[in-house]
Regions:
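Non-catalytic helical/linker scaffolds that mediate oligomerization, partner binding
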Residues: 1-484
Length: 484
């Protein structure tokens, strides 16, 4: 069973329960919805169908974030190298061959002569050669076609847009109403952008978790404060590869993953993981290696976009990613391990989590069980990327969905506040029935004071047989994995 988590994007054009169930059984842990391509009705349908399939699948919704786009066109415009174009920030006016209008009124104030304007995810490049008040003059650098409402990127420049659009605010309120688990905030530049979302959540007393999408140089530069401000990070390599030189992407990805592991925050690697499988049943060797390398870097999760949202082989894409992940987890080298305590940050709970993981390596402990209200102990354990599964008993139903982004964690919702002994015994029995444990195997139990905020205070190690010999019959509820 893979330990790396999989996020799969789903469109409202293909979101029936049978389809979602197939993705779930193939290895999907979290459903992601892109609000740029979904209506409110579509979002409601996706959420309803996901919850009908299983209450254990996490749901993530994107914001649009601070982005610039071109305006409408009567028909696609063809450009040749050397064409000269005037550019204005007039969102209410259509664009033509000679005049391109964009959605941001102050575009001319935020860029300078010599900057490149990249349209349509970098497909068309225009270099600014003159600036005259509200008008920019640009020269086309490559042949290309410009359609309606295409993205506009200006690598290296700060575009002074608000963190949230009105549509974003409406979608966040919809996410609160539907009790969605994660908001993936696009184009996060600093901690203030995260706070803009958090303020809305706080005003509605919502516990939705924020995932910050790193898609520009500002986000990379301010990554430490962004990590501190949010639940997790997504390395969104699509726009990031436009905003920064593409050869820097692997190094940025590696450094962000390392920082997230040290902070015990979930990290997702996204974009073009299996892009070939949008149209073809098999991936390229480069894509297989890309997925494996993300796991070798120690990512928590991987994300599929068009592969599952609109591709011809969505289920096969998830199955393929799961197989690659499982093999990469076996092949990863300890030389690439990241120590969350290497910067001198040692507290009791992190120390005990490290001790439990070391026990799996040096004492032959076959599995770890923990419980809690917040999931922090489980995330501490995930940060050490141990070789064996961690069963996390969750006292909140939403907690098991939040932990669907944490490496190696099998979350189980425990409704009843039974005794610690009963809960522990039932967890061992579940792992035994799933084939993770044998009678002579050792198991570690990480726990502490009961109730939220109590903290981790002890590690117990015992043999499975001895636990069963000294216990009564207890059972944990299903989390859906028994049927896989």
């Amino acid at each position: 069973m893979k330990q790396t988590k999989i996020v799969a994007s789903i469109s409202d054009r293909r979101c029936d329960q049978d389809f979602i169930r197939k993705l779930f059984f193939a290895g999907m842990n979290v459903v992601r919805m892109n609000t740029a391509h979904a209506t409110e009705e579509g979002i409601r349908t996706i959420v309803k169908n996901v919850r009908a399939v299983s209450p254990h699948i996490g749901i993530m919704i994107d914001t649009k974030g601070p982005e610039v786009r071109t305006t409408g066109v009567k028909e696609p415009i063809n450009y040749n190298v050397g064409d000269v174009v005037k550019i204005f920030g007039r969102p209410e006016m259509e664009s033509s061959h000679d005049i391109v209008n964009v959605s941001y009124p102050d575009i001319a104030a935020d860029v300078k002569v010599g900057d490149d304007l990249l349209f349509d995810d970098g497909e068309l490049d225009m270099k600014i050669i003159d600036s005259q008040g509200p008008m920019l003059v640009a020269e086309v650098q490559n042949e290309g076609v410009l359609g309606a409402h295409k993205s506009v990127n200006v690598p290296g420049e700060h575009i002074d847009l608000p963190a949230l659009t009105e549509k974003d605010r409406r979608n966040i309120e919809l996410a609160i109403e539907l009790d969605i688990d994660f908001i993936a905030h696009s184009f996060v530049r600093n901690a203030a952008d995260v706070k803009a979302v958090q303020d809305i959540l706080d005003a509605h007393n919502s516990d939705i978790k924020i995932i910050s999408k790193i898609e520009n140089q500002e986000g990379v530069d301010n990554i430490d404060e962004i990590i501190d401000a949010c639940y997790g990070i997504m390395v969104a390599r699509g726009d990031l590869g436009i905003e920064v030189p593409i050869e820097r992407i692997p190094g940025i990805q590696r450094r962000i993953i390392s920082k997230c592991v040290k902070a015990q925050k979930p990290v997702i690697v996204a974009t073009q993981m299996l892009h070939t499988m949008i149209k073809n049943p098999r991936p390229t060797r480069a894509e297989v290696t890309d997925i494996a390398n993300a796991i070798f870097y120690r990512t928590d999760a991987l994300m599929l976009s068009g592969e599952t949202a609109s591709g011809k082989y969505p289920v096969e894409a998830v199955q393929t990613m799961a197989r690659i992940a499982e093999q990469a987890e076996k092949d990863k080298s300890p030389l690439n391990d990241i120590d969350p305590m290497e910067d001198g940050k040692i507290d009791q709970k992190l120390f005990l989590a490290h001790a439990a993981i070391e026990a799996t390596k040096k004492l032959g402990v076959a599995g770890i069980i923990t419980d809690g209200e917040t999931g922090q102990t489980a995330r501490d354990l995930a940060a050490f990327r141990g070789p064996n599964p961690v069963l996390a008993i969750c006292y909140k139903e939403k907690l098991q969905r939040w932990l669907n982004l944490s490496y190696g964690i099998i979350p189980i919702h425990q409704k009843d506040q039974v005794s610690t002994k009963a809960m522990f015994t039932a967890a061992v029995r579940m792992l035994r029935q799933k084939g993770y444990l044998g009678e002579e195997d050792k198991i570690a139990y990480l726990s502490g004071s009961f109730g939220e905020g109590g903290g981790t205070t002890f590690v117990e190690i015992n043999k499975v047989k001895k636990i069963f010999d000294n216990s009564y019959s207890f059972n944990l509820p299903s989390n859906g994995i028994e049927d896989k």
